Regions:
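A structural micro-motif at secondary-structure boundaries
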Residues: 1-20, 32, 83, 89-96
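Short linear functional motifs in flexible/disordered or boundary regions
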Residues: 33-34, 50-51, 81
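Short amphipathic alpha-helical recognition elements used for nucleic-acid or partner binding
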Residues: 10-46, 67-69
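Alpha-helix C-capping/helix-to-loop hinge sites
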Residues: 5, 45-49
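DNA-recognition element of transcription regulators
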Residues: 13-23, 51-74, 84-88
Length: 96
């Protein structure tokens, strides 16, 4: 199954793990997603695409994936906000 995300009608180029991070944030848009929830989602997503089930994604790797996704959606109407001590939140970008 092919999964795609579009920004302004253009497909967003994401690695499988970047896709998984953005997917979970989109599914829970407006709610804080913890690093543990992201780790669990990445593990189940990895299993679905054939990665070894023992692969654990650490906090630093999650921070890197979130940073990469932030850069890739920086021109969209959404932004990923860090909620210090809790996790991440996908929300509509505030008007400038």
């Amino acid at each position: 199954m092919e999964r795609r995300i579009f920004v302004d009608a253009a497909p967003l180029e994401l690695s499988p793990r970047e896709f998984a991070v953005l997917e979970l944030l989109m599914l829970r848009q407006g709610r804080v997603v913890s690093k543990v929830q992201l780790q669990e989602h990445l593990a189940s997503f990895g299993h679905a695409i054939g990665e070894a089930s023992h692969d654990v994604v650490g906090d630093t790797a999650i921070e890197v994936y979130v940073h990469r996704v932030r850069r890739k959606i920086e021109h969209s109407e959404a932004e990923i906000v860090t909620v210090r001590g809790f996790g991440y939140l996908l929300q509509a970008r505030a008007p400038v």
